[in-house]
């Protein structure tokens, strides 16, 4: 049999940069103390304040490395805790030249207002650097799964919240295209919030780039074969997340990304036969339908919500 890497080339053209491991991302609690050096050192503009004119200085010169509370970092930039109009926010600083497509995709979410979607407050694109200012939330769902098992009632409520967020996006004509635990933040009151729309696409518009959409292990098979992400692709990804919330395992852990892509495209799914879902198999049946190989076999978001509501009522 041909190697997974050779077979993968036929499925899609993948940028190695997109497949980088992003496990280094660490998000801090919004209650973490932070020192406002802008008030303490008036001679130097502080990265903690991104109001004008400080924001313009940051876009021109960047942030001094010795300043700033880093919330996370990845291939497309670094996220800092900052102040904007007197409030604590999360500010993602990116190199404009490398992130034009990401910025355009993030703009898809700039007008989305939903309790389960991280609010984008401002997007400013400079010649050298660009800045995305967002609502500040807590840690990621992935962080929660890494440390503590989730009670079954919390699992279904998280799944419902993210499904409602996706339903709102789809009704607004936006496909997220990268649903995974690292892109779901947990607020201080326990509400899940969908974030990072850097891979998102608009429904009904042709793809303008050939970039890889999503993360291996979570990407729907039709997308791996070169098709544009659709609402059904988001449902597939959420099905993987639903499995992960009770297994607390990473899909296809330990395999090379090329092998994961090959297996997913061919119809393989994470092992789940021996797991007790806590709902007499109803929850397991739901996520298996969500990750169906054929898009027409996947439930729509309203069907997912209806099933979850029956589980919550138990």
Where do the PLM segments sit?
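Short beta-strand micro-motifs within the conserved protein kinase catalytic domain, predominantly
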Residues: 119-128
């Amino acid at each position: 049999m041909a190697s997974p890497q050779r077979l993968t080339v036929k499925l899609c053209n993948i940028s190695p940069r997109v497949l980088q491991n992003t496990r280094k991302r660490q998000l801090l609690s919004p209650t973490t103390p932070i020192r406002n050096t802008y008030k303490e050192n008036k001679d130097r503009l502080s990265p903690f304040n991104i109001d004008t004119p400080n924001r313009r200085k940051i876009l021109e010169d960047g942030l001094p490395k010795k300043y700033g509370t880093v919330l996370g970092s990845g291939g497309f930039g670094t996220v800092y805790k900052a102040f904007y109009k007197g409030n604590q926010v999360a500010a993602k600083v990116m190199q404009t030249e490398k992130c034009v497509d990401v910025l355009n995709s993030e703009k898809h979410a700039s007008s989305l207002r939903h309790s389960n979607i991280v609010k984008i407050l401002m997007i400013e694109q400079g010649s050298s650097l660009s800045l995305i200012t967002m609502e500040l939330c807590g840690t990621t769902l992935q962080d929660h799964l890494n440390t503590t098992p989730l009670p079954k009632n919390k699992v279904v409520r998280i799944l419902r919240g993210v499904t409602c967020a996706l339903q709102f996006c789809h009704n607004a004509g936006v496909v997220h295209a990268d649903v995974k635990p690292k892109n779901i933040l947990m607020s201080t009151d326990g509400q899940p919030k969908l974030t990072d729309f850097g891979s998102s696409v608009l429904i009904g518009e042709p793809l303008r780039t050939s970039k890889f959409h999503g993360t291996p292990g979570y990407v729907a098979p039709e997308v791996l074969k070169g098709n544009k992400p659709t609402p059904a692709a988001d449902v597939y990804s959420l099905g993987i997340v639903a499995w992960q919330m009770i297994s607390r395992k990473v899909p296809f852990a330990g395999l090379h990304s090329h092998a994961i892509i090959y297996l997913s495209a061919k119809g393989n799914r994470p092992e789940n036969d021996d797991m007790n879902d806590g709902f007499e198999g109803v929850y397991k049946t739901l996520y298996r339908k969500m990750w169906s190989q054929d898009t027409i076999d996947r439930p729509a978001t309203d069907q997912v919500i209806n099933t979850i509501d029956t589980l919550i009522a138990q």
